[in-house]
Amino acid sequence: MDSFGRAPPLWPQSALPRVPGAAPSSSGLPWSRVGEIAIFTFVAVLALYLLWSWVGRDLLLVLKARRGGTTEELTFGPRERHSLPAVAVARVENPPCPSGSVEARPFTG
């Protein structure tokens, strides 16, 4: 009775399910890390776009207006600006009012 205290196995060892001790290691980046990088890149591009559309354009308009340029039409790049000739504004004299010949009566009609 050499095997005192040891019971014989009920099933053979090959029939038992094998449970791995640890998950196999992958050689590249895990998919969760790739997803994090993709989401971070998307959020960063969206943030830069919103920053430009909300803040950057308005800041450019303010700086252009402070330099004395027009904010109606911005030109980018090396374009030649043609200045418009100065138009002389003639002062128009108001015609004189009729002198007392017309009697003003409001709300009559």
Swiss-Prot record:
<dbReference type="Pfam" id="PF01708">
    <property type="entry name" value="Gemini_mov"/>
</dbReference>
<protein>
    <recommendedName>
        <fullName>Movement protein</fullName>
    </recommendedName>
</protein>
<keyword id="KW-1133">Transmembrane helix</keyword>
<feature type="transmembrane region" description="Helical">
    <location>
        <begin position="34"/>
        <end position="54"/>
    </location>
</feature>
<keyword id="KW-0812">Transmembrane</keyword>
<keyword id="KW-0472">Membrane</keyword>
<dbReference type="GO" id="GO:0016020">
    <property type="term" value="C:membrane"/>
</dbReference>
<keyword id="KW-0813">Transport</keyword>
<dbReference type="InterPro" id="IPR002621">
    <property type="entry name" value="Gemini_mov"/>
</dbReference>
<comment type="subunit">
    <text>Interacts with the capsid protein (CP). Part of a MP-CP-viral DNA complex.</text>
</comment>
<comment type="function">
    <text>Involved in the viral transport within, and between cells.</text>
</comment>
<dbReference type="GO" id="GO:0033644">
    <property type="term" value="C:host cell membrane"/>
</dbReference>
<feature type="region of interest" description="Disordered">
    <location>
        <begin position="1"/>
        <end position="28"/>
    </location>
</feature>
<comment type="similarity">
    <text>Belongs to the mastrevirus movement protein family.</text>
</comment>
<keyword id="KW-1043">Host membrane</keyword>
<keyword id="KW-0916">Viral movement protein</keyword>
<dbReference type="GO" id="GO:0046740">
    <property type="term" value="P:transport of virus in host, cell to cell"/>
</dbReference>
